[in-house]
């Protein structure tokens, strides 16, 4: 895949510790490198979000999460694979393989393989990314670039231009072990 210059620029910024905004399937998201504690701390401060809540990781394909799945039953892998890429987020046991600034106080981590072309292109270059809705805590998620500018004027390192994916609601969240819906779409 030949990546566009704007996605390549976003990838370079993320590798350097940037916090960026980007379009997703339904709303704008904020993201950064999940392994960069300073970047995650900045993202949480920008959102006024507690580290205890945990964050979603998004990826280009399921194999970007393979390091988490080593001891998972095949039925779990099949369950996730059947819904990805797409607007389905799964809460999966993280087995202490991720930093606490990603998982918060939870035994699980939220994972999604996006079907948004820009997100997939970006993740193909940098690997899994933090993804959280682009809004200060308690405010509606941004659905326009203008709202991004209003919410975060001067606080973001880059806004990756693009269109939302056309979904009205954020992704469905389910618990992988039980299949129960935690948040409807």
From Swiss-Prot:
It is found in: Cytoplasm. It catalyses: L-threonine + hydrogencarbonate + ATP = L-threonylcarbamoyladenylate + diphosphate + H2O. Disulfide bonds: none annotated. GO terms for biological process: regulation of translational fidelity; tRNA threonylcarbamoyladenosine modification. GO terms for molecular function: ATP binding; double-stranded RNA binding; L-threonylcarbamoyladenylate synthase; tRNA binding. Gene3D superfamilies: DHBP synthase (3.90.870.10). Keywords: ATP-binding, Cytoplasm, Nucleotide-binding, Nucleotidyltransferase, Transferase, tRNA processing. Its EC number is 2.7.7.87. Residues 4-185 form the YrdC-like domain. It comes from the Bacteria. SUPFAM superfamilies: YrdC/RibB. Belongs to the SUA5 family. TsaC subfamily. This is Threonylcarbamoyl-AMP synthase.
């Amino acid at each position: 895949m030949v990546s566009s210059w704007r996605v390549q620029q976003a990838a370079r910024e993320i590798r350097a510790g940037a916090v960026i905004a980007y379009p997703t399937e339904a709303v704008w998201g904020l993201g950064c490198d999940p392994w960069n504690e300073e970047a995650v701390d900045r993202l949480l401060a920008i959102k006024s979000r507690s580290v205890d809540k945990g964050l979603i990781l998004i990826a280009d394909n399921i194999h970007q999460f393979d390091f988490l799945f080593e001891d998972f039953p095949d039925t779990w892998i099949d369950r996730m694979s059947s819904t990805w890429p797409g607007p389905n987020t799964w809460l999966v046991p993280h087995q202490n393989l991720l930093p606490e600034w990603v998982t918060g106080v939870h035994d699980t981590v939220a994972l999604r393989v996006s079907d948004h072309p820009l997100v997939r292109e970006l993740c193909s270059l940098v690997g899994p990314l933090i993804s959280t809705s682009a809004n200060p805590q308690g405010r509606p998620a941004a659905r326009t670039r203008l709202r991004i500018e209003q919410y975060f004027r001067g606080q973001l390192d880059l806004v990756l231009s693009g269109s939302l994916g056309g979904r009205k609601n954020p992704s469905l969240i389910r618990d992988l072990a039980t299949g129960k819906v935690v948040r409807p779409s």
